[in-house]
């Protein structure tokens, strides 16, 4: 059942894959993948293709959708569903990979191969696929033999390590929560099982057990619950498992990286600290809790979220498991307790609370209970500990100074100490584990490294730890990319293989450089180290430096979140991560209070002192010097060159790790997280897709498919696979490469499957696996042969032995026969009687000699024993000496090791100091060099400036020359253009367009004058805007002045408020003191309650006023804060307005260059400016009103505070007076008490001794009563005070809520106004951006005309000078407004043209993007098809060769086709005849196929018979020789049958091929007869006749073959009958044997059951006896208790009588002393109360006695019941003993029966074996005859096949040639048509291009002509202005003159150029 459950999660359901309905559905619907927002991709059927889009119907809902063709991805056939290796997919794309992973995940298949690596998806539940049975399944198996699993990856790594002697590494990578740690555990589990030196897997070795237990310990101390993962590794580890030459584990070593120690002191919401804290608090017993001073969860400050549980995990059980793991690891109990004490100490450190002293910033510790607990746990002095934290000694120069710490510094020191302690403990634990795992002395030959490091993390708040973790993951991903993509391809190129380098674009080096680059520009870690060197450096300065240095880096961004949440953003491979740089400098430096560190080093606890043994390497407070008074611990000054930062150490550690990984052969396991909710069975497709893209899964599969992932060195290839090609390599020396080439030729591998390099042979994926299978088969054959030889040798030896035995038996028989003859002979009898008598005398002598020898031997034995004892004593002495020496040696080695460690530390320290010195010297030199370099640069710059000035002058002169040259070149250009125009005028269509353009140019010339008027109006607008800007600037200045005044008043108020707060604090302290005094007085004096109540009322009033003062102060503070906020907002507004003003200026300058459409925008802007002015004025008014209100509030608050101060002073005076009166009253009451006490003393002397005792009791009772009443009074008073306080609080709360509402309303109003302003600003900015975009487009078009504008520069200057004159003249030209409108229309047309062009441009860009996408998609498809292309190339070459022949034939056939149309019918008739013959041949083939099937079935039967015969081998083993003989004969038979079967299969295959060929040929012949019936009648007839003959021959041969086969079938049937008889005999023998074995097993089972019952009875008897003993003990204890209770009862009764007597006496005394006065009355009351109490006690005693009696009764009942049970158990034990004796008897009888059965079975077997041997001999003879007959038949069949093949091949070739020729002709014609179309399109495009070019040229010419006309017009205007007579119709006339020349763009450019000058 367990195996079936496991198979469900390992193997794919084959029925699902081979479903024909799904295959048909896929083929019919044309299913594809379409993008989906919900599920990533969804299936759809392709319905129609329309251009670049396609219409698809969604499978899920049947909805039809239009999708871009580029977004559609191909779907794989259903047979590839849930494929185990994604490299096998035919269509490799994102959708297919995601679908495959999703299908497998939903089926419970979490492992999937992806080319060379494995993809794992976290199932979030336990699967039954990690048991020992599964490990055994995967052990030693090849990858392709088993389904994907982590065990398969581990096994391949282990096998390749053993085979290649190369170190391996298994890298589990992925995000946090993807399952890396769990897979690492499974890897270790597999290796511990497979590579264990102990072969009995149930009892594993100690080392393997320790290796498995290392993980739980490290997880307990280093793992924690996070948001993403319940068991997240908060440290990285690299587990190195060492193996010896034989592959056994000899040791292990664990390296850890970057423990997140800050988690020990604080955790995020819903997260836990390290597991061990919770394990300890839940699992510790009461005794342990008291020893470790443990408290509940909520009492610890360091457990931020209290007791957070993990679902499905019990912390209590986990604690026990962890402690058990430590025991297995060999950690002694002392060290375990030391660990637990440190953990408790860390928790207690969090409970130390510091407070700020009243008048100073110094910290104090009001309650030192937590400090006492810490010092007790860590073995240090409390006073030294508190002094070290509050006033540590710091080295200043040469002296030591005690410096008082602030509260913040003390808190920081405690947290740093807690973190350091936990980290050191963790490091010690890792070293201890390594010591346990490395204790073996065997040398490791190679190792497997397993990397489990924290996954990629993106939290809400990411800090320094997350940066280090993500940096590590970047490096690992880069290693993966480098090994998979770059190194792979580089090796191909090195080895000289034909390979085109593919760039997959997965280089992560830029991101790594951003983090780790040391210089040019420095990375983040380098900048962090640099900031740690600088004094007064803060986290803020570090962030600024990062922004400055890396701001332009492509992988670096400014965060989009608020500054509170993030400081900068890095684009990692897994996504963007926002980092918050809080306390990064401190985390990087990791400073510590060295006073406490030395204290811990000197601890009385050995464990703690060992943890802190390297105190000299700590960054202490003397190194972190000069803390500023106001700054927090983030602003320390560090002394240079005194430490190495955390970042540096981690970087070095990581570099070492990467170096070791590069030296190994990496095996990648890519872990994927399916969802963030930790739900089983849920998969988020987009999340998985992102991870697949980041991990480079698709690229990895692609390179695995395209490349050659398997490679073998030449020597190794030859050595390993030479067995497959035994005779291919000649004898003698041969080069490895040549040998490999010969071997590959012999193996007949396809050339596409391999490549031969310079030193290796490269194979495609799967080829080596195939070779390995063939090698295994070959080796099995060789071994079978070897076994046969061995068995033959053994059989021969056994035969020779039998022969010797036979001869010996003959000798014995001969001797026995002789004795039988002699025994009755009388002389022989006499001889036998006399001979012993002769030997008697000799025997006596021999006995004497023997006795003497015996004495000597005994003496020798005694001497030897003495020697032996001496030797043993000597040995024991030597052993003791040896042990002493060993101990001494161990001590010496330990001392040596410690000395070595010290030496290493000193040398390391020395090296560090030397490095620091060198660094400092180098820096000094660098600084000097920089200074020199800067000075030199300064000089160079000055020289450069001079040179540049000279160059500028030269360039100006050169520019003038160039302008002259330009004019000449333009003239030449004009000539060339004129020639072009003459050539192009031939086209009639273009002439019409030219006329239209000329008309437009005429219109433009008329509109030019109107444009000039517009420019003038724009200039006016500019002046207006400038005036407005100046006004706004003046207002801003006023605002700033007002703000400054407000700042001054605010500072004054802040100062007043601080003074008031100090006074209030003093008053509060005084009130607290008064409270204490009042409490004391209340305890001493009950009479003064009324006065105290009055004082309490006054106190409440004072408290009320104080609270009011506090609320007022808080209100003032809130007002101040709001004032600050408003000031900041005003400053922001000021900045925004300034930016807007600048934008407006730029816009005004730009508007002078714009057209009429932009005038509308200007008018809008003017309106917006007016609105802005209004809003600004309103805001200024509101702001002034607010400031006035604030001032009034402040003045009122100050007055109120002053009044309250006076009131508090008055209250204080009253309280002091009340205090004095109370003290007086106390004195008076004390006197009265003294008098009363004297009276009481007199009365006490008179009373008896009993009364004295009673009085003492009563005094005690009264004191208790008094205390109770006083407490009750106090409680009532406090309750009253509480009620008053709550009332006051509620009043103040209501007031504060009202104020907050008002304040929030005001704030909301302000925010609304600000939002309105911001929206307006946004709109303006958007408009300005749009304007700029339009202008940019305009400028891009103008760039074509820049050359002409430069030429006209001089003319424009002249125009600019005349603009002033022209402006005056234009006032008179207001009548020509109509022209403006026409110009505007023209401009609109131009804008439309521009928009059209821009749209075209955008369309082209979009089309380009689409083409790019299609290009990439096609590239991918092309890569996939390249493999198929190699196969197709050969056929293409053949087709090209035949193309030429076909062209010739085609020409001939066209001429003759008409002639042979008549003869078509005749050919068709002949074809029909041939078809009938072909059908008959097909029938014959079917019959042959049936015969083949029958033969196969027979073969299977023979195989089963063989197996049965093999299984029927005798268990006893006597007739092995005969059975082996029969087996060999049967094997020979089977081999012969196999050969015959293979021959028959070959024949059948040939016939099938012939059939197929005939069918194809017939169809080809039909087509051929239709096309080419050209003079080939005779040839066809002859061929036909030949074919008929051949068919007849074939038919005859087929008939012969059928006869022979029928004969063979008959013979086979005979054989089958014989075999069946044999089988029947064997079955009967087997049945007999099975029955005997079954009986034996039954008997054995019965015996076992009996033994079990016997054991059970014994155990139960022992248990009963133990219970009886326990019951007897309980009885005795109960009896003792009963006696004790009886004694107590008697004592209670005595006490009761005494109490009753006392009561009577007291009653009498009370009756006598009733008239004594007030004192007596009081005493009476007391006595009565005492009596009542005594009565209550009596009642209680009675109740107790009753309970005791009940218990006694119950105990007696229990005793009786126990006695009865005891008797029953004794009788039961007796019965069991009798049953046991009976079972032993039965057992003996069964054994006797068993021996008898075995004898009978052996005799039966011998008889059956002899019969079988005889039958086997007969069968062998029959088989020999049959084989001979079949060989003859096979020869005949082969001859006929050869003839048939030759004929069919001839026919086939002719048909194929004809078809190929026709296809090639069709293709050629289609190609020609396509080429023609392309030519036509190209010609059209050329014509369009020429037309556009002509248009532009014409426009250029028109522009130049209009410019000339404008110049002329300007000159004429000047002349007329001088004269003073200028008519109004000049512009229109000019327009008419300018008709026929100029263009749209030129006029626009001209106008722009004209208008640009005034804007300057």
Curated annotation (Swiss-Prot):
Residues 2-838 are annotated as: Mediates interaction with LIMCH1. In the kidney, expressed in the glomeruli. Also expressed in leukocytes. Residues 1035-1057, 1118-1137, 1877-1960 are annotated as: Disordered. The modification Phosphoserine is found at residues 628, 1114, 1714, 1943. The modification N6-acetyllysine is found at residues 8, 102, 299, 435, 613, 860, 975, 1024, 1234, 1249, 1357, 1392, 1404, 1410, 1459, 1638, 1793, 1802, 1845. One of its GO terms (biological process) is leukocyte migration. Residues 1035-1055, 1122-1137, 1948-1960 have a biased composition (Basic and acidic residues). Residues 837-1926 form a coiled coil. GO terms for molecular function: actin binding; actin filament binding; ADP binding; ATP binding; cadherin binding; calmodulin binding; cytoskeletal motor activity; identical protein binding. Residues 27-77 form the Myosin N-terminal SH3-like domain. ATP binds at residues 174-181. Residues 779-808 form the IQ domain. The rodlike tail sequence is highly repetitive, showing cycles of a 28-residue repeat pattern composed of 4 heptapeptides, characteristic for alpha-helical coiled coils. Belongs to the TRAFAC class myosin-kinesin ATPase superfamily. Myosin family. It is linked to Macrothrombocytopenia and granulocyte inclusions with or without nephritis or sensorineural hearing loss: An autosomal dominant disorder characterized by thrombocytopenia, giant platelets and Dohle body-like inclusions in peripheral blood leukocytes with variable ultrastructural appearance. Some affected individuals lack leukocyte inclusion bodies on classic staining of peripheral blood smears. Alport syndrome-like features of nephritis, hearing loss, and eye abnormalities are present in some patients. This is Myosin-9. It comes from Homo sapiens. The lineage of its organism: Eukaryota, Metazoa, Chordata, Craniata, Vertebrata.
């Amino acid at each position: 059942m367990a195996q079936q459950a496991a198979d469900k999660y390992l193997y794919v359901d084959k029925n699902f894959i081979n479903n024909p309905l799904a295959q048909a559905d896929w083929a019919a619907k044309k299913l594809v993948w379409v993008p989906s927002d919900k599920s990533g991709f969804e299936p759809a059927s392709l319905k129609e293709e329309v251009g670049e889009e396609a219409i698809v119907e969604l499978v899920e809902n049947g909805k039809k959708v239009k999708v871009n063709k580029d977004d559609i991805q191909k779907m794989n056939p259903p047979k590839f569903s849930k494929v185990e290796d994604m490299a096998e997919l035919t269509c490799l794309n994102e959708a297919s990979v995601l679908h495959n992973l999703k299908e497998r995940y939903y089926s419970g298949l979490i492992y999937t191969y992806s080319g060379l690596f494995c993809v794992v998806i976290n199932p979030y539940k336990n699967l039954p696929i990690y048991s020992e049975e599964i490990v055994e399944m995967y052990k030693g198996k090849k990858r392709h033999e088993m389904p994907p699993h982590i065990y398969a990856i581990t096994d391949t790594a282990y096998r390749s390590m053993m085979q290649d002697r190369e170190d391996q590494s298994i890298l589990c990578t992925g995000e946090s929560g993807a399952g890396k740690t769990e897979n690492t555990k499974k890897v270790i589990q597999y290796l511990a099982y497979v590579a264990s030196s102990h072969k009995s897997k149930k009892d594993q070795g100690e080392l393997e057990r320790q290796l498995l237990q290392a993980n739980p310990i490290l997880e307990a101390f280093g793992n924690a619950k996070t948001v993403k993962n319940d068991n997240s590794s908060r440290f990285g580890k690299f587990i190195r498992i060492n193996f010896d030459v034989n592959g056994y584990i000899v040791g292990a070593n664990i390296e850890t990286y970057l423990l997140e120690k800050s988690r020990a002191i604080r955790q995020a919401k819903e997260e836990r600290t390290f597991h061990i804290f919770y394990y300890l608090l839940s699992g510790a017993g009461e005794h342990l809790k008291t020893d470790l001073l443990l408290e509940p969860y909520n009492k610890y400050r360091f457990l931020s979220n209290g007791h957070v549980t993990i679902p499905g995990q019990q912390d209590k059980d986990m604690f026990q498991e962890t402690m058990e793991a430590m025991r297995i690891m060999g950690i002694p109990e002392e060290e375990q307790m030391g660990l637990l004490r440190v953990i408790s100490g860390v928790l207690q450190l969090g409970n130390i609370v510091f407070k700020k002293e009243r008048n100073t910033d110094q910290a104090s510790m009001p309650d030192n209970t937590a400090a006492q607990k810490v010092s007790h746990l860590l073995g240090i002095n409390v006073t030294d500990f508190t002094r070290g934290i509050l006033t540590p000694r710091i080295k200043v120069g040469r002296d030591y100074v005690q410096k008082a710490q602030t509260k913040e510094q003390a808190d920081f020191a405690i947290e740093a100490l807690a973190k350091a302690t936990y980290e050191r403990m963790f490091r010690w634990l890792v070293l201890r584990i390594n010591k346990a795992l490395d204790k073996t002395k065997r040398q490791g030959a190679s190792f497997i490294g397993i990397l489990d490091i924290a996954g990629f993390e993106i939290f809400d708040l990411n800090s320094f730890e997350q940066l280090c973790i993500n940096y590590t993951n970047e490096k690992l991903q880069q290693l993966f990319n480098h090994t998979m993509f770059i190194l792979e391809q580089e090796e191909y190129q090195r080895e000289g293989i034909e390979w085109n380098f593919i760039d997959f674009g997965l280089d992560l080096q830029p991101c790594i450089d951003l983090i780790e680059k040391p210089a040019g520009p420095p990375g983040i870690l380098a900048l962090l180290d640099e900031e740690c060197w600088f004094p007064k450096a803060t986290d803020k300065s570090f962030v600024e430096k990062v922004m400055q240095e890396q701001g332009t880096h492509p992988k670096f961004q400014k965060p989009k979140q608020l500054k509170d949440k993030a400081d900068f953003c890095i684009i990692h491979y897994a996504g963007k991560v926002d980092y918050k740089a809080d306390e990064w400098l401190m985390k990087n430096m990791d400073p510590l209070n060295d006073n406490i560190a030395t204290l811990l080093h000197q601890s009385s606890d050995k464990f703690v002192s060992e943890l802190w043994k390297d105190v000299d390497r700590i960054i202490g407070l003397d190194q972190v010097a000069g803390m500023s008074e106001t700054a927090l611990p983030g602003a320390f000054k560090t002394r240079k060159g005194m430490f190495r930062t955390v970042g540096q150490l981690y970087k070095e550690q990581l570099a070492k790790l990467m170096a070791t990984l590069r030296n190994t052969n990496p095996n990648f396991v890519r872990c994927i997280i399916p969802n963030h909710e930790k739900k089983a069975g849920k998969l988020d497709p987009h999340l998985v897709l992102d991870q697949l893209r980041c991990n480079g899964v698709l690229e990895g599969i692609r390179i695995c498919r395209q490349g050659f992932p398997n490679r073998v060195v030449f020597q190794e290839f030859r050595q390993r696979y030479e067995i497959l090609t035994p005779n291919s390599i000649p004898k003698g020396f041969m080069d490895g490469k040549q040998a490999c080439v010969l071997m590959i030729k012999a193996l007949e591998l396809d050339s596409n499957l391999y490549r031969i390099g310079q030193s290796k042979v490269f194979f495609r994926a799967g080829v080596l696996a195939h070779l390995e299978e063939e090698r295994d088969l070959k080796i099995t054959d060789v071994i079978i042969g070897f076994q046969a030889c061995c068995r033959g040798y053994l059989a021969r030896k056994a035969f020779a032995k039998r022969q010797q035995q036979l001869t010996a038996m003959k000798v014995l028989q001969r001797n026995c026969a002789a004795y039988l003859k002699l025994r009755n002979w009388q002389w022989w009898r006499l001889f036998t009687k006399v001979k012993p008598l002769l030997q008697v005398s000799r025997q006596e002598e021999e006995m004497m000699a023997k006795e003497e020898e015996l004495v000597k031997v005994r003496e020798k034995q005694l001497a030897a024993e003495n020697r032996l004892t001496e030797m043993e004593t000597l040995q024991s002495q030597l052993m003791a000496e040896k042990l002493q020496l060993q101990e001494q040696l161990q001590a010496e080695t330990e001392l040596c090791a410690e000395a070595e460690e010290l030496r290493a530390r000193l040398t390391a320290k020395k090296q560090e100091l030397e490095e620091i010195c060198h660094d400092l010297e180098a820096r000094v030199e660098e600084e000097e060099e920089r200074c020199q370099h800067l000075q030199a640069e300064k000089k160079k710059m000055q020289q450069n400036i001079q040179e540049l000035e000279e160059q500028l002058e030269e360039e100006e002169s050169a520019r003038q020359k160039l302008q002259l040259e330009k004019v000449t070149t333009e003239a030449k250009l004009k000539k060339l253009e004129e020639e072009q125009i003459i050539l192009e005028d031939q086209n009639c269509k273009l002439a019409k367009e030219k006329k239209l353009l000329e008309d437009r140019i005429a219109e433009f010339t008329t509109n030019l004058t109107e444009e000039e008027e517009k420019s003038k109006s724009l200039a006016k607008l500019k002046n207006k805007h400038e005036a407005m800007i100046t006004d706004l600037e003046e207002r801003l200045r006023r605002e700033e002045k007002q703000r400054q005044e407000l700042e001054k008043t605010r500072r004054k108020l802040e100062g007043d408020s601080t003074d008031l707060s100090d006074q209030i604090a003093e008053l509060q302290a005084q009130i607290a003191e008064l409270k204490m005094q009042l409490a004391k007085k209340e305890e001493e004096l009950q009479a003064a309650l009324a006065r105290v109540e009055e004082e309490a009322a006054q106190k409440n009033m004072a408290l009320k006023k104080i609270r009011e003062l506090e609320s007022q102060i808080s209100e003032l503070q809130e007002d101040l804060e709001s004032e600050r906020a408003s000031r900041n907002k005003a400053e922001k507004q000021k900045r925004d307005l300034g930016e807007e003003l600048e934008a407006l200026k730029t816009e005004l300058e730009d508007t002078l260059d714009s057209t009429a459409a932009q005038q509308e925008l200007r008018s809008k802007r003017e309106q917006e400016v007016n609105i802005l002015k209004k809003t600004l004025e309103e805001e200024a008014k509101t702001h002034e009103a607010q400031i006035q209100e604030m001032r009034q509030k402040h003045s009122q608050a100050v007055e109120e505070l002053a009044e309250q101060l006076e009131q508090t002073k008055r209250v204080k005076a009253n309280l002091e007076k009340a205090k004095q009166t109370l003290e007086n009253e106390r004195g008076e009451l004390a006197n009265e008490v003294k008098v009363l006490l004297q009276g009481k003393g007199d009365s006490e002397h008179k009373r008896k001794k009993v009364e004295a005792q009673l009085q003492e009791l009563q005094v005690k009772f009264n004191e208790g009563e008094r205390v109770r009443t006083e407490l009750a009074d106090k409680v009532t008073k406090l309750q009253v005070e509480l009620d008053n306080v709550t009332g006051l609080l509620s009043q103040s709360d209501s007031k504060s809520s009202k104020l907050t509402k008002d304040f929030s309303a005001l704030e909301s109003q302000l925010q609304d106004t600000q939002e309105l302003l911001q929206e307006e600003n946004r709109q303006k900015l958007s408009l300005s951006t749009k304007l700029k975009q339009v202008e940019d487009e305009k400028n891009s078009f103008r760039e074509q005309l820049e050359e002409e504008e430069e030429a006209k520069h001089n003319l424009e200057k002249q125009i600019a000078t005349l603009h002033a004159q022209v402006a005056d003249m234009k006032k008179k030209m207001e009548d020509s407004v109509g022209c403006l409108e026409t110009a505007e229309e023209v401009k609109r047309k131009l804008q439309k043209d521009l928009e059209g062009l821009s749209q075209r441009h955008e369309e082209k860009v979009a089309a380009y993007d689409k083409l790019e996408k299609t290009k990439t998609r096609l590239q991918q498809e092309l890569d996939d098809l390249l493999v198929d292309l190699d196969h197709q190339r050969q056929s293409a070459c053949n087709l090209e060769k035949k193309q030429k022949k076909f062209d010739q034939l085609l020409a001939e056939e066209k001429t003759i086709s008409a002639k042979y149309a008549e003869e078509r019918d005749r050919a068709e008739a002949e074809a029909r005849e041939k078809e009938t013959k072909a059908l008959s041949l097909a029938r014959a083939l079917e019959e042959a196929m049936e015969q083949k099937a029958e033969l196969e079935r027979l073969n299977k039967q023979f195989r089963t018979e063989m197996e049965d015969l093999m299984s029927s081998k005798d268990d006893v083993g006597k007739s092995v020789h005969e059975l082996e003989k029969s087996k060999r004969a049967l094997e020979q038979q089977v081999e012969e049958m196999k050969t015959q079967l293979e021959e028959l299969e070959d024949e059948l295959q040939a016939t099938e091929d012939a059939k197929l060929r005939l069918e194809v040929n017939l169809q080809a012949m039909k087509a051929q007869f239709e096309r080419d019936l050209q003079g080939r009648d005779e040839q066809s007839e002859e061929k036909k006749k030949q074919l008929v003959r051949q068919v007849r021959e074939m038919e005859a041969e087929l008939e012969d073959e059928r006869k022979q086969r029928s004969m063979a079938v008959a013979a086979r049937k005979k054989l089958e009958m014989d075999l069946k008889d044999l089988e029947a005999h064997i079955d009967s023998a087997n049945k007999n044997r099975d029955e005997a074995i079954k009986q034996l097993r039954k008997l054995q089972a019965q015996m076992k059951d009996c033994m079990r019952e016997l054991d059970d009875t014994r155990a139960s008897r022992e248990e009963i006896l133990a219970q009886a003993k326990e019951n007897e003990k309980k009885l005795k204890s109960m009896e003792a208790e009963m006696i004790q209770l009886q004694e107590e009862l008697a004592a209670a009764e005595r006490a009761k009588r005494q109490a009753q007597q006392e009561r009577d006496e007291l009653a009498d005394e009370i009756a006598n002393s009733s008239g004594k006065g007030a004192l007596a009355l009081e005493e009476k009351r007391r006595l009565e109360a005492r009596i009542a109490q005594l009565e209550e006690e009596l009642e209680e005693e009675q109740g107790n006695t009753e309970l005791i009696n009940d218990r006694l009764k119950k105990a007696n009942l229990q005793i009786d019941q126990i006695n009865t049970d005891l008797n029953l158990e004794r009788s039961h034990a007796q019965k069991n003993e009798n049953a046991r004796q009976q079972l032993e008897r039965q057992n003996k009888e069964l054994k006797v029966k068993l021996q008898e059965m075995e004898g009978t079975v052996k005799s039966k077997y011998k008889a059956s074996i002899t019969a079988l041997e005889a039958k086997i001999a007969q069968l062998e003879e029959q088989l020999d005859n049959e084989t001979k007959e079949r060989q003859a038949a096979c020869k005949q069949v082969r001859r006929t096949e050869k003839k048939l093949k030759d004929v069919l091949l001839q026919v086939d070739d002719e048909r194929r040639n004809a078809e190929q020729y026709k296809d090639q002709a069709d293709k050629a014609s289609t190609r020609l048509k396509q080429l023609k179309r392309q030519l036509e399109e190209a010609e059209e495009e050329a014509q369009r291009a020429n037309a556009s070019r002509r248009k532009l040229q014409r426009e250029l010419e028109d522009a130049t002509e209009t410019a000339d006309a404008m110049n002329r017009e300007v000159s004429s205007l000047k002349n007329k202005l001088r004269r003073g007579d200028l008519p109004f119709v000049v512009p229109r006339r000019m327009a008419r003159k300018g008709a026929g020349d100029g263009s749209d763009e030129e006029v626009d450019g001209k106008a722009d150029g004209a208008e640009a000058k005034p804007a300057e």
